[in-house]
């Protein structure tokens, strides 16, 4: 899948769109607890299509009449705003470091009830603010408002904040680039997620990650 394409919105009858509907159904099947609403997407390495995949899944869920919030927590290399063609604006980092209301920084996409929370201003300490009590309180509040909260994050093998987010989430999906990712790295990523006490729901193998 080409980077940056919202295929599930532009081509809802395509094979790829149908694959995302299958992913949605599988996640529903694996989630028996209705209070499990926060799902993290991460990858073994960088450039494996995590942002594009999670954005397409968010669109798929919104088209099924779910109220969805997509959070770009890849604070080092954010991409969600580019996928949805949104201008750089206040977002997650501003919400965590300033006295702002979440409703003032949420972006509506116009696709069903899909909202996005972009990464916000650049910071030097992503792990520190992700570890804050405010981050956890924010996620708890979002669970009372949205049916599903999807979190985009950087690679699990390199960054502490992804391990923290995995622990906060009700389920984690791992992205792997076919022909790009070594099996040893996949095994190590699974081990790191287990150490973070993450609920690993499954793996998505992305055929075209560039």
Label the model's feature ranges.
Residues 52-53, 57:
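Hydrophobic positions on the alpha1 helix immediately C-terminal to the Walker A/P-loop
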Residues 1-47, 183-210:
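Short boundary/hinge segments that flank catalytic cores
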Residues 40, 115, 152:
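Conserved beta-strand segments that form the floor/walls of ligand-binding pockets within enzyme
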Residues 98, 127-210:
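Conserved catalytic-core segment of NTP-binding enzymes
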Residues 2-21, 25, 32, 43-45, ...:
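P-loop/Walker-type NTP enzyme "switch/lid" segment
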Residues 30-33, 64, 109, 145, ...:
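Alpha-helix C-cap/termination motif
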Residues 25, 59, 63, 167, ...:
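Short, well-ordered alpha-helices that flank and scaffold nucleotide-derived cofactor binding pockets
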Residues 65-69:
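Helical hairpin unit composed of two closely spaced alpha helices linked by a short loop
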């Amino acid at each position: 899948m080409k980077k940056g394409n919202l295929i599930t919105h532009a081509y809802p009858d395509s094979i790829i769109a149908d694959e995302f509907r299958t992913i949605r159904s599988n996640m529903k099947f694996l989630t028996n607890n209705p209070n499990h609403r926060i799902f993290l997407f991460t990858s073994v390495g960088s450039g494996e299509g995590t942002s594009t995949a999670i954005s397409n899944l968010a669109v798929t869920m919104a088209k099924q009449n779910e109220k969805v919030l997509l959070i770009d927590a890849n604070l080092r290399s954010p991409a969600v705003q580019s996928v949805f063609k949104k201008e750089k604006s206040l977002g997650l980092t501003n919400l965590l470091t300033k006295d702002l209301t979440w409703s003032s920084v949420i972006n509506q996409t116009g696709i069903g009830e899909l909202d996005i929370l972009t990464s916000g201003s650049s910071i030097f300490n992503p792990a520190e603010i992700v570890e804050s009590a405010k981050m956890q309180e924010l996620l708890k509040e979002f669970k009372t408002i949205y049916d599903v909260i999807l979190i985009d994050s950087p690679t699990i093998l390199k960054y502490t904040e992804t391990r923290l987010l995995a622990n906060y989430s009700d389920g984690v999906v791992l992205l792997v680039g076919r022909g790009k990712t070594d099996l040893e790295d996949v095994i190590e990523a699974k081990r790191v997620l287990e150490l973070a006490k993450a609920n690993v729901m499954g793996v998505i193998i992305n055929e075209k990650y560039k």
